[in-house]
Amino acid sequence: MKRLLIAMVGLVLFCACAGTAPAQNGRGAAELKLNGKAVSVDYGRPALKGRQVEDMLGQLPAGEVWRLGADKSTTFKTATDLVFGDVTVPKSEYSLWARKEADNSWKLVFNKQHGQWGTDHDASQDLPGIPLKETKPATPAEQVTIGLTKTGDGGEITIGWGDMELSTDFKAK
């Protein structure tokens, strides 16, 4: 009887504690093929939940990075060398970030470290920043959305959240 009581108390405690783990956001992914080689991104999808993206990202000081998602860092994989303007991104796996500039513009940052928690950014592992174009989307995005779209002989990466959309073009080298 004593063992049964201990087992029941243990089960109740286990069930009570199981509900207190922090909820993780859903994950999103996008992929495209360039010259038969895969380019992909995997990211966390935080939701605004009634908040404004300007209020949240507006607090980020110039020179700091946004992890482009939630939870585990956003992962970008490419099986071919890519060219973003004058920046070459060699085929590899990276964590992906956006750095806020002093003029409130954004730069896309590929970091050689990947798989880390989304707040563990080592700037010494960054490739040069790539300017992002900011526009207003036709429809605001409640959750962070990252898309890869084929355009001619290259592609476009688009990052949307709320009424902000960031994008840049790239080509296979």
Please tell me what each predicted stretch does:
Residues 8, 34, 84:
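Short glycine/serine/threonine-biased micro-segments
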Residues 17-30, 80-81, 88-92:
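Short, charged N-terminal helix-start/capping segments
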Residues 21-64, 114-173:
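Primarily secretory-pathway and cell-envelope proteins
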Residues 67-116:
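Mid-length scaffold segments of soluble, non-membrane domains
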Residues 7-16:
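Bacterial N-terminal signal peptides
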Residues 1-4:
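Positively charged n-region of N-terminal signal peptides that target proteins for export
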